[in-house]
Each structure stands twice: as C-alpha cells, then as structure tokens.
Amino acid sequence: MKQLESFEIPRTVIFGPGAISKIHQIVASQKASKILIITGRSVTLQYAKTIADMLTDRSVEVLRYDYIDIEKSGFDLVLGVGGGRPIDMAKVYSYVHKKPLVIVPTSASHDGIASPYVSYTLAQKMIKYGKIMASPIAIVADTSIILNAPSRLLKAGVGDLLGKIIAVRDWKLAHRLKGEEYSEYASHLSLTSYRIVVANAARIKNFVREEDVRVLVKALIGCGVAMGIAGSSRPCSGSEHLFAHAIEIRLEESGGDAIHGELVALGTIIMAYLHGINWRRVKKIAKLVGLPTTLREAGIDYDLAIEALVVAHTLRPDRYTILGDGLSKDAARRAIEATELA
C-alpha cells in the first residue's frame, strides 16, 4: 500500500491584462492588515509602489530584496513583486515566518513564478533555515506588465521550458536505475508545458503581443504546479539545470552574471546529446526563438563550460541524472564539440 501523499499548489491564479487590479481582492480574502512587499530595483520597484498605493487601507512596507532582514517579523502577508530574485526572497521570508505568499511576476524568465522552490544558489545560502518550500496562495500575472519586460528575459523563459524534456528523462532514469519515486502526473504536466511552448515557438518568438506572453506564462505556471505535485523540483530540473547552476556558482564567485534560462537552453542541448535524443531539434527551436546556441553567444568561457560539465553531478548528489558519476574532461569536450556549442 502506498503512503499518504500531500502537496501544495497555488490556490488562485489570475492572469491577463489588468490582472494587477485584483490584488486588493486577494489581500482582503486573507484578512491581512500588515503587508510586506519584496521587490527589485527601478521598474519593478515602481510596480511595487503602484501595488502599495492600491492598499492604502492596510499597513504596507516596500523593500528591495537585497535590503531584506529575513529575521524581522510583524507581517501578515508577503508579496513578491518582480523577477527571480525578489520572488525567491519572498519565498524565503514566507517560509521562515510561515506567512501566506502572493507572487506578482513582472517578467517570465523561469518557472519560479509558480514553484514552491528557490534557486539553487539562494537555497545554499539559506540552508540554515532548512529546505525552503513556500507555495504561493495566489499568482497575479499581469500580461500587460510582463509584455513590457525585456524580450531577452522572456526568451529565457522559453529556454527554461526547453529543459523540461531533459528533466523528465533524467527522472525516469533515476526511477529505473535507483528506484526513485516517480510521478507520472507531475511528469506529464511538465512535458505538456514543454510541448506548448515548442508548438508555439515560431508564433510567440518576438513577444510583441499579449497572447504571446499568455502562452509563456501558462506554460511556466504549469511547471510550478508540477513541482508542487511532485513535492520537489524533479519534474522540471535535471542535468540541464545542474550544468546551469555550476556555471552560475562560478560566475557569482568571480562577480560575473548570466541569464538562467539561456544557460538551461545550452545545458538542454548538451544533455539531449548525452541522452541520445535529437539535440539538433532542441538547438533549432532555441535558435528560432533567439536564444544563444553557442557558448560565445551566451558569453560563457569554453573552459568554464567544461568545468561545469565535470562538476555538475556533485551539486545534487541525491539527484541521479544522465551525468551519472560525472563526465571526464574529455567526455565534456566531446559533448560540447559534438553539439557545436564551441
């Protein structure tokens, strides 16, 4: 007999042009009087202030994610307004203080807009609090706002979605070889998100219409739900993400930066090759959308990419993938050269 299962997924999802106007309604449903809005810099900060102006009947504090004191209490509800970093920090605060979370994405560059989990690098920094897991009670995705995000970030959202084909294959592999628990339902949701964006890639690639953003947001939210059902990021994060994380860690140490979804797209091409599936098709879709399809286009040094492939498997030793016990440097070079990334 199987054990009991439980999972948390967003209770309310509101998306479309003007969705931001519904925030007061969501806040009222929570009977929250003291609200913390965690946001980013410049444009996202302005959106956060706009939301604060909608909540003048409440006590609202707006803070940038890099100014947050995680230990400070006294709020009834947390709003994460912005891109990846503000949203992730809002999840951390929500988890630590056990307060409800509302996510208001101003871009759609990755599936964190609906997932309970934070980025690998932030999770490591916040390890003293345990495994961060904060499923939002509501997601308010105003597509008229997201449409104004830099197109490079929206294309990165497609890159993150391309990785789902690898994540699910890695999960199946771990299930077959290591007996890891596997959810057909969560996998199906993740792959459906992948298929939606691939089927519409040619139509949405320039992100000039509201419906283009709508397709992307729906797919990303689907991935967030998949992770909630699985109880982990497994259906949406495999070896392609380990490669991306390995690069992100090295860049952070050296003061560099990269766009997550672009790295995931490159990782997906490499891992498709290792899995023996059609990596050329993945690369073709990435190119069609306007994602980097070489290391040079992504601004990634060749030696850094080799190092990332060699060490990627060590980042999550509990997560078996096609990388197995790791690639040798020669195998890493062959993979990069075979996929014409260099």
Swiss-Prot record:
Cross-referenced PANTHER family: GLYCEROL DEHYDROGENASE, GLYCEROL DEHYDROGENASE 1
Gene3D superfamilies in the cross-refs: 3.40.50.1970, Dehydroquinate synthase-like - alpha domain
Binding positions for substrate per the UniProt entry: D111, D160, H245
Residues the entry annotates as binding Zn(2+): D160, H241, H260
Role description: Catalyzes the NAD(P)H-dependent reduction of dihydroxyacetonephosphate (DHAP or glycerone phosphate) to glycerol 1-phosphate (G1P). The G1P thus generated is used as the glycerophosphate backbone of phospholipids in the cellular membranes of Archaea.
EC numbers for this chain: 1.1.1.261
Species of the source: Pyrobaculum islandicum (strain DSM 4184 / JCM 9189 / GEO3)
Enzymatic reactions: sn-glycerol 1-phosphate + NAD(+) = dihydroxyacetone phosphate + NADH + H(+); sn-glycerol 1-phosphate + NADP(+) = dihydroxyacetone phosphate + NADPH + H(+)
Cofactors that this protein relies on: Zn(2+)
Record keywords, A-Z: Cytoplasm, Lipid biosynthesis, Lipid metabolism, Metal-binding, NAD, NADP, Oxidoreductase, Phospholipid biosynthesis, Phospholipid metabolism, Zinc
A GO BP entry: phospholipid biosynthetic process
UniProt remark on cofactor binding: Binds 1 zinc ion per subunit.
One Gene Ontology molecular-function label: glycerol-1-phosphate dehydrogenase (NAD+) activity
Protein name, per record: Glycerol-1-phosphate dehydrogenase [NAD(P)+]
Lineage start: Archaea, Thermoproteota, Thermoprotei, Thermoproteales, Thermoproteaceae
UniProt cross-references to InterPro entries, sorted A to Z: G1P_dehydrogenase_arc, G1PDH, Glycerol_DH
Subcellular location: Cytoplasm
CDD domains in the cross-refs: Gro1PDH
Binding site for NAD(+): G84, R85, P86, I87, D88, T106, S107, A108, S109, S115
Pathway connected to this protein: Membrane lipid metabolism; glycerophospholipid metabolism
Self-association state and partner proteins as the record states: Homodimer.
Domain of life: Archaea
Protein family: Belongs to the glycerol-1-phosphate dehydrogenase family.
Gene Ontology CC terms, in alphabetical order: cytoplasm
